[in-house]
Amino acid sequence: MTEKIRVGIVGYGNLGRGAELAIQQQPDMELVAVFSRRGKVDTVDPNVTSVHIDEAKNYQDKIDVMILCGGSATDLPEQTPAFASMFNTVDSFDTHAKIPEHFAKVDEAAKKSGKISVISVGWDPGLFSINRVMSEAVLIDGNTYTFWGKGLSQGHSDAVRRVEGVKGGVQYTIPSEEAMDRVRRGENPVLSTSEKHKRECYVVLEDGADPKKVEETIKTMPNYFDEYDTTVHFITEEELKRDHNAMPHGGFVI
């Protein structure tokens, strides 16, 4: 291929770094620039250009597609429609209840600009969706159950960190072993959200933050924690760095 696909990355957290590494493995792609609210960032490849997100509009003739690596809680609802008005885009928006609303906003922006936007192609929705489609195409009689974890949810961890008074934090999704056993036994149970998973949060507070207010805000957060059995643990910054710096995850489609 003589002409490579020119790619930009918006947002440079764990997902943004992963996108950079993935692009490095693709012979038909080149990373033009990383765009971040922080401006200059330390990219995996020090030769990659990184600029402030506000400068993205100046790259419309230099980039073929933008990979949007922000969080679903507050970033992508604003960023994807905005970037779809200037670029072809891809995002991994995963707030399931709000996908129709997100689609409508992005679709409107992309149609006005004549661009193409692909939304919600991450883990779930995304790879797990493909697993479900393949399984249901073969096993047409039955129910499909998805269990996430045990592992660290980057999206829910990001949502925790956006809460006022939170300095740092992570969230672990824990599937119910009892619920999975019932499914594996062929009972075809009807399971509520809270019966399938629990959520555990480990939070570092800002100085002077009210722990009760923070806990209540997390537990009642719509689309993230309000329907789950959620436990909030308050820990020190040292404990967060020592005990929660890995990002394991997994899951089951049954």
Question: Where are the language model's segments positioned?
Answer:
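General beta-strand structural signal in soluble alpha/beta enzymes
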Residues: D91-S92, S117-V121, F147, V170-Q171
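Rossmann-fold NAD(P)-binding glycine/threonine-rich loop
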Residues: F93-S117
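Oxidoreductase and adenylate-handling cofactor-binding alpha/beta cores
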Residues: K105, L127-N143, D158-Y172
